[in-house]
């Protein structure tokens, strides 16, 4: 299965009648493995900040998480494993695997819990597969 198929079939799939607004699978170095068409264009320093927060949990808390110039307030995640952010009625979930970052961005009516489920389920699967 291609990485694009993982984005299309596992991240942008319908869950309880809702879908993520955008999603991507990135390498730890910021390389794009696959992304949905409307995934925000991000800067290398934004990816570096995300990776640093996984290495040093709490790094992004004072400044917020930026992706594509959009600022998300960092909310409770799982240190070193999952970063969660909130912006207005939407937010972001990022799951780290051994080789990749799985990102899902949502807006209402999708709930944070639904986004977490979609992103973390794929991340756990990829970890089990050695990624």
Swiss-Prot record:
Keywords: Actin-binding, Cytoplasm, Cytoskeleton. GO terms for molecular function: actin monomer binding. One of its GO terms (cellular component) is cell cortex. It is found in: Cytoplasm, Cytoskeleton. Signal peptide: none annotated. It comes from the Eukaryota. CDD domains: PROF (cd00148). It holds the Pfam family Profilin. Binds to actin and affects the structure of the cytoskeleton. At high concentrations, profilin prevents the polymerization of actin, whereas it enhances it at low concentrations. By binding to PIP2, it inhibits the formation of IP3 and DG. Occurs in many kinds of cells as a complex with monomeric actin in a 1:1 ratio. Belongs to the profilin family. This is Profilin-3. It comes from Triticum aestivum.
